[in-house]
Amino acid sequence: MSSGGLLLLLGLLTLWEVLTPVSSKDHPKFCELPADTGSCKGNVPRFYYNADHHQCLKFIYGGCGGNANNFKTIEECKSTCAA
């Protein structure tokens, strides 16, 4: 096999490893972050994944800032973090 073919194979294997979870309990690292209301004073109902309780919970988001553990729907939260 040529060196170009080996590099392509190595790249594909690396991509596959990154995209394939080890188990069904794996989730993105941001699912471990705490709920963060952000720096604004809004009153926006959102959901976050509570890693201690292994469930999606409602919180009030201020409308700006915060972190990635912030979902518009409970379904989006569950499919991202609790699947």
UniProtKB/Swiss-Prot annotation:
Pfam families: Kunitz_BPTI. Its main location: secreted. Disulfide bonds join C31-C81, C40-C64, C56-C77. The record marks K41, G42 as: Reactive bond for trypsin. Residues 31-81 form the BPTI/Kunitz inhibitor domain. GO terms for molecular function: serine-type endopeptidase inhibitor activity. Residues 1-24 form the signal peptide. The keyword Secreted applies. The keyword Disulfide bond applies. GO terms for cellular component: extracellular space. It comes from the Eukaryota. It is found in: Secreted. Keywords: Disulfide bond, Protease inhibitor, Secreted, Serine protease inhibitor, Signal. Expressed by the venom gland. PANTHER family: KUNITZ-TYPE PROTEASE INHIBITOR-RELATED, SERINE PEPTIDASE INHIBITOR, KUNITZ TYPE, 3. Belongs to the venom Kunitz-type family. Serine protease inhibitor. Does not inhibit plasmin, and does not reduce blood loss in the mouse tail vein blood loss model. This is Kunitz-type serine protease inhibitor textilinin-4. It comes from Pseudonaja textilis textilis.
